[in-house]
Amino acid sequence: MSKKGGYKGVQVDHRYNDESVARFINAVMLDGKKDVATKIVYDAFAIIGEKMVDENPLEVYRRAMSNIAPVVEVRSKRVGGATYQIPMEVKPSRRGALAFRWLKQYATKRGGRSMAEKLAAELMDAASEQGASVKKRDEVHRMADANKAFAHFRF
């Protein structure tokens, strides 16, 4: 029997009491600097609260995550000397991880403001089904749709 305890999971976020926000903070974190990542995410939520007065920043965040998260993706499989792109359904944990990764990636690529402002802008765009991260999700869905013919090669 193992002496170590199992995986305890992510602690909920102390301000919004939400596990998804805590996971997002961990995704934004660089080089183990969690305080910096927490400040960036909370400042982004504050900016969303200022710009979208009638909406709760947490609801904007949730709507953005559901708009970014992919349902299907393509995976490569080698069959008889040829490599096929096979459309596969994305597991819920991977959906969230991809959404976090794309949101962080495209927020970082935005113009030269603070990271909190760039993250807030990308979240607001994603909540209204615009922005680069939503385009990335649409591109992944288009690739899966284009390769439907190879769906019978499933793993």
From Swiss-Prot:
Record carries keyword Signal: no
Keywords for the protein's UniProt record, in alphabetical order: Ribonucleoprotein, Ribosomal protein, RNA-binding, rRNA-binding, tRNA-binding
InterPro entries: Ribosomal_uS7, Ribosomal_uS7_bac/org-type, Ribosomal_uS7_dom, Ribosomal_uS7_dom_sf
Molecular function as annotated in GO: rRNA binding; structural constituent of ribosome; tRNA binding
GO cellular component terms listed in the entry, alphabetical order: small ribosomal subunit
Keyword Ribosomal protein: yes
Role: One of the primary rRNA binding proteins, it binds directly to 16S rRNA where it nucleates assembly of the head domain of the 30S subunit. Is located at the subunit interface close to the decoding center, probably blocks exit of the E-site tRNA.
Quaternary organization: Part of the 30S ribosomal subunit. Contacts proteins S9 and S11.
Protein name as it appears in the record: Small ribosomal subunit protein uS7
Species the sequence originates in: Chlorobium luteolum (strain DSM 273 / BCRC 81028 / 2530) (Pelodictyon luteolum)
Lineage: Bacteria, Pseudomonadati, Chlorobiota, Chlorobiia, Chlorobiales
